[in-house]
Swiss-Prot record:
<dbReference type="GO" id="GO:0034045">
    <property type="term" value="C:phagophore assembly site membrane"/>
</dbReference>
<dbReference type="InterPro" id="IPR048720">
    <property type="entry name" value="PROPPIN"/>
</dbReference>
<dbReference type="GO" id="GO:0000425">
    <property type="term" value="P:pexophagy"/>
</dbReference>
<feature type="repeat" description="WD 3">
    <location>
        <begin position="311"/>
        <end position="349"/>
    </location>
</feature>
<dbReference type="GO" id="GO:0009267">
    <property type="term" value="P:cellular response to starvation"/>
</dbReference>
<dbReference type="GO" id="GO:0000422">
    <property type="term" value="P:autophagy of mitochondrion"/>
</dbReference>
<dbReference type="GO" id="GO:0061723">
    <property type="term" value="P:glycophagy"/>
</dbReference>
<dbReference type="GO" id="GO:0005829">
    <property type="term" value="C:cytosol"/>
</dbReference>
<feature type="repeat" description="WD 2">
    <location>
        <begin position="228"/>
        <end position="267"/>
    </location>
</feature>
<dbReference type="GO" id="GO:0032266">
    <property type="term" value="F:phosphatidylinositol-3-phosphate binding"/>
</dbReference>
<dbReference type="InterPro" id="IPR001680">
    <property type="entry name" value="WD40_rpt"/>
</dbReference>
<keyword id="KW-0072">Autophagy</keyword>
<protein>
    <recommendedName>
        <fullName>WD repeat domain phosphoinositide-interacting protein 2</fullName>
    </recommendedName>
</protein>
<comment type="similarity">
    <text>Belongs to the WD repeat PROPPIN family.</text>
</comment>
<dbReference type="Pfam" id="PF21032">
    <property type="entry name" value="PROPPIN"/>
</dbReference>
<keyword id="KW-0446">Lipid-binding</keyword>
<comment type="function">
    <text>Component of the autophagy machinery that controls the major intracellular degradation process by which cytoplasmic materials are packaged into autophagosomes and delivered to lysosomes for degradation. Involved in an early step of the formation of preautophagosomal structures.</text>
</comment>
Length: 436
């Protein structure tokens, strides 16, 4: 998630970007000085597995699972995507686009580049542009989600700038799959589960989170995170088994919902006055306005987390580390917070460790005083950082943008194209294409 534009202190380390990889086993961090990868195999130690200082002002850095393939965008060249083999320190290829790159999504089949009013679908094996979705509704936040499942390889993005419509696109067969009327307000967050069969959505209002079946678009679950105030949802994330869904926002509370269907018990005739009254009350809900009836049927949080800050943009993930379910929160204050989740009882989650995203660690009982509740909310989009003056015009590239192509690739290193297997996390997909 983009954290550019944070008006911050030295504690944030000039953080511009943070995101978990597809299976939540590593964390990528982009900053003014370059980018880093951290392993998430331990709670006690945040192990730095790689650091690059060759590229400054890294505003997007996405790693393909645990492979060496990484996609990078810099504020100094915001229209240029570089695909690199970070362990070898080599650039595989690059592409230039017609506008600022707002988001990049990866799985083992596709690479998606999101611009404000278009989406480019690349074949990750050779980086050819397979399809371009043009003239999408304005999407200045670069909101989109890509399923990590090879068989259910769907892309979700806003279908409207004024209401919460979700467009679902099949990136394998390159055709529209469905349009889901998810919310009345514009979309704020999207997330697929690992199987690609569920999609979680939240609107700018931020009070209700819904889960739909994919590609059918049937509403499966509806959760209410609150009724007192509207919030800005920063992040939605499923656990890898699809049983839990976390939602973080610009408030201090992270909600975790359990995706379970309550089995209906056979109806029995009430034998007491209270039982009869309860039956009448439930029957009466059918006469209430639909909005009120929905509130009766909405699920509540199974577990919650109280963050030591309020107002920071953040990214959350549900991961199993050392055989224990954890909630991970990477925040614009430059820290990664690790909480334990009780999968049976839920309730308030326990803060186990907090790590600085420079690799150092602080005990759970030493919460920083600087993480106060009156800190301003960070800029919501990468484009906001550009408009604040961070943008520096990029140097001329080998290929200029042309309207016919939309995305133009640079040279590819030939020695990177041999003997590389897509299903090996220690390697990356073979890049065999060269430009037209």
């Amino acid at each position: 998630m983009n954290l550019a534009g944070q008006s911050g202190d030295a504690g944030s380390g000039h953080l511009l970007f943070a995101n978990f990889n597809q299976d939540n086993t590593s964390l990528a961090v982009g900053s003014k000085s370059g980018y880093k990868f951290f392993s998430l195999s331990s709670v006690d130690k945040l192990e730095q597995i790689y650091e690059c200082t060759d590229t400054e002002d890294v505003c997007i850095v996405e790693r393909l699972f645990s492979s060496s393939l990484v996609a990078i965008v810099s504020l100094k060249a915001p229209r240029k995507l570089k695909v690199c083999h970070f362990k070898k320190g080599t650039e595989i290829c690059n592409y230039s686009y017609s506008n600022t790159i707002l988001a990049v999504k990866l799985n083992r089949q596709r690479l998606i580049v999101c611009l404000e009013e278009s989406l480019y679908i690349h074949n990750i094996r050779d980086m050819k542009v397979l399809h371009t979705i043009r003239e999408t509704p304005p999407n200045p936040a670069g909101l989109c989600a890509l399923s990590i499942n090879n068989d259910n390889c769907y892309l979700a993005y806003p279908g409207s700038a004024t209401i919460g419509e979700v467009q679902v696109f099949d990136t394998i067969n390159l055709r529209a799959a469905n349009m889901i009327p998810a919310h009345d307000s514009p979309l704020a967050a999207l997330a697929f589960d690992a199987s690609g069969t569920k999609l979680a959505t939240a609107s700018e209002k931020g009070t209700v989170i819904r889960v739909f079946s994919i590609p059918e678009g049937q509403k499966l679950f509806e959760f209410r995170r609150g009724v007192k105030r509207c919030v800005s949802i920063c992040s939605l994330a499923f656990s890898m088994d699809g049983m839990f869904l976390s939602a973080s926002s610009n408030t201090e509370t992270v909600h975790i919902f359990k995706l379970e269907t309550v089995k209906e018990k056979p109806q029995e005739e009430p034998t007491t006055w209270t039982g009869y009254f309860g039956k009448v009350l439930m029957a009466s809900t059918s006469y209430l306005p639909s909005q009120v009836t929905e509130m009766f049927n909405q699920g509540r949080a199974f577990a919650t987390v109280r963050l030591p800050f309020c107002g920071h943009k953040n990214i959350c993930a549900l991961a199993t580390i050392q055989k224990i379910p954890r909630l991970l929160v990477g925040a614009a204050d430059g820290y990664l917070y690790m909480y334990n989740l009780d999968p049976q009882e839920g309730g308030e989650c326990t803060l186990m460790k907090q790590h600085k995203l420079d690799g150092s660690m602080e005990p759970a009982n030493e919460i920083l005083e600087s993480a106060s509740h009156d800190r301003p909310l960070v800029a919501q989009t990468y484009s906001a950082a550009v408009t604040k003056g961070t943008y520096v015009p990029s140097s001329p590239t080998r290929h200029a943008y042309t309207e016919d192509l939309g995305a133009v690739g640079g040279a590819c290193l030939e020695d990177e194209t041999n003997s590389l297997r897509l299903d090996e996390d220690s390697e990356h997909p073979p890049m065999i294409l060269r430009t037209d």
